[in-house]
């Protein structure tokens, strides 16, 4: 069976979605607060380097370029250290999210199948009514 989801009128229901992008973003910032600090330090150093370049202050410009490199190093260290520290937790979270996704896909599939069964039953009922009407019309034609 392919990984593509089956179409259904239940796709718009919110119970099929667990964590929004904003919730994930805030959770990740809370888990690893040093990464945004590193981004901010790097951005600040770049901004100060730009201001120094415009002012013609080459000494401050070189200091800020070094600060930018330190900011990058700090950010990279925070990413690697956070990856090591939260590695096991992330694996467990991925397994949990995969289980939720499988459950959600199964619910969608079951809902879709129920919907198809209802449509099939309605179609069969309509065909039976149509056949009964045709039979009654033929009977009336024979008598008439």
From Swiss-Prot:
<dbReference type="InterPro" id="IPR007667">
    <property type="entry name" value="Hypoxia_induced_domain"/>
</dbReference>
<dbReference type="InterPro" id="IPR050355">
    <property type="entry name" value="RCF1"/>
</dbReference>
<keyword id="KW-1133">Transmembrane helix</keyword>
<feature type="transmembrane region" description="Helical">
    <location>
        <begin position="33"/>
        <end position="50"/>
    </location>
</feature>
<feature type="domain" description="HIG1">
    <location>
        <begin position="6"/>
        <end position="97"/>
    </location>
</feature>
<comment type="subunit">
    <text>Associates with the respiratory chain complex III/complex IV supercomplex.</text>
</comment>
<feature type="coiled-coil region">
    <location>
        <begin position="86"/>
        <end position="142"/>
    </location>
</feature>
<keyword id="KW-0496">Mitochondrion</keyword>
<dbReference type="Pfam" id="PF04588">
    <property type="entry name" value="HIG_1_N"/>
</dbReference>
<protein>
    <recommendedName>
        <fullName>Respiratory supercomplex factor 1, mitochondrial</fullName>
    </recommendedName>
</protein>
<comment type="function">
    <text>Cytochrome c oxidase subunit which plays a role in assembly of respiratory supercomplexes.</text>
</comment>
<keyword id="KW-0812">Transmembrane</keyword>
<dbReference type="GO" id="GO:0097250">
    <property type="term" value="P:mitochondrial respirasome assembly"/>
</dbReference>
<keyword id="KW-0175">Coiled coil</keyword>
<feature type="transmembrane region" description="Helical">
    <location>
        <begin position="69"/>
        <end position="88"/>
    </location>
</feature>
<keyword id="KW-0472">Membrane</keyword>
<dbReference type="GO" id="GO:0031966">
    <property type="term" value="C:mitochondrial membrane"/>
</dbReference>
<comment type="similarity">
    <text>Belongs to the RCF1 family.</text>
</comment>
